[in-house]
Structure formats: structure tokens, C-alpha cells
Amino acid sequence: MPILIVLMFLLGTELNKEAFVNVTRNPKAVLLGVAGQIVLLPAIAFILAWLLDMPPVYFMGLVLIACCPGGSSSNVFSMLAKGDVALSVTLTAVSSIVTLFTLPVIMELTSHIVSHNAGISIELPVGKLFVQNIVLLFVPLMVGWFFRRWKPIQASQVSKVLNKLAFPALMTLALLFFLQYTQEIIDNFRLIGMACGLLILASMACSSLLSRIGRLTQAARRTIVIEVGMQNAAQAIAIAVSPFIFNSGEVAIPAIIYALLMNVILLTYVYAIRLRERR
């Protein structure tokens, strides 16, 4: 949870007037990007989990990570891919706020369907989930934003330091969970790894197609592909292990595997772009 708070504070320190102006300046790109993050990805996750006949705990975990947009490194990946960095910041901010309301609804619907199909009872305290998202997402985001407005120079310095620490911190968190649930991850890696890999690739392909249909610029298309593919694993893990919500490390396992695979796949995507442009 502390890592999630730091990541959201970091996002807040990076928000500027341009991020909000971009919503009105480039509404089509923002709308398509948010739709890909909030609607497309959870839908693909649900379909994959159903087709692969995943156990309820992993079914919920896969949909959960799909409902947590706004990866902490998406802006860096967008820059490396020569995408629209301003759009990346806007999408991360907007989706982080929108998910406060969409995540509880989607997870509540998923829990009902999974409970009915599996013949078990999965209780999801929607109110507590909403409150936790406010405390862990919205509050630190706003604190970071106000800090930038109050002390812009110091905020910029803090942002540079936190940006260097964010990725290693997230990977450390994933590693600690991996060590704690090593045997279970190994036993189920084929199923969960396949589901996460297919989810990432399918979401990237669908978001690219969506962007092309919308006739967005090449830079915007690349950014949307990255934004849709990169998720906030820290948020998913915080919800999964929270004693007020799922209180289950098993639900967090898809998020852990997703976090590892998404960086490998997106780095490969960025490398392929850079390699193609050198020719």
C-alpha cells in the first residue's frame, strides 16, 4: 500500500495545466484511450478468464488487474516509443480518477457472475473498496498536484527522484510476493501466464485497431497501445491483500505475473519501434 500511495503522489506531481487542457484539445484520443483502458481491457480479461475456465480466485484476479489502469512507467515507455507523452500523462490521470467509480462496479458484477457459475459465495464490500480507492488513489494524487502548484521547483526535484525509484520498487514488491507464493505461482504459471500474456497482446492489438479506426496520429496510437497494455499492479495488489476487501494473496497472483510480463512485452514493443525507425 505505501508503494501505491507514493506512485499516486508521483503522478500528482507530474500533473500540469497541459494535462487537463489536452482533454478538450484532443478529445477523440483521450476518449478512445480511456475507453480502451476502462471498457476494452476488463472485457477482454473477462472473456479470456471464461474461455480458459480459470478458478474463481484467479478469474477475479485477472479481471481486477484489468480494472486498474495507469501504470507508473507508462509515460517513460511512451517517450521511448516516441509517442505522445502529454496524452500519456492525461490518460493516466483521467483513467486513475474514472476507475474510482468503474472498478467497484465491474468487480461487483464479476463477483456475482463468478459466484453464480461456480456455485460459491464471493462477497465484495463495494463501499469499502470505494473508500480505499479514495484514500490510496485520489488523496495522494491531489496532494501531489497541490504540492506541484505550491512548490513547483521542489515538486519537480521530488518527481525526478521518485521516477527513478518507482519501477525498482514495483519490481521488488512483485518479487516479494513471488517468493511468498512461489509454489502456487509455479503450479499455476502456465494457466495464469497464458491468460496474462494473451490479455496484454490482445489489448494492445485491439487498442491499436481502435486508434487506427479513430484515425489518430502515429504518436497517439503508440501511446494508447502502451497505456492500455500497462496496468497499475500496485493498486491491484493493494486491493487483493487488503483485510477490508479480498484479504487474499492468491487474488494478487495474476497482478504479479501481469506486472512482470507487461514490462517484457512493452519493452519488446518499444525496441521493435526503435529498430524499425533506424532502418
Q: Which residue ranges define each predicted feature?
A:
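Alpha-helical transmembrane segments of multi-pass small-molecule/ion transporters
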Residues: 1-279
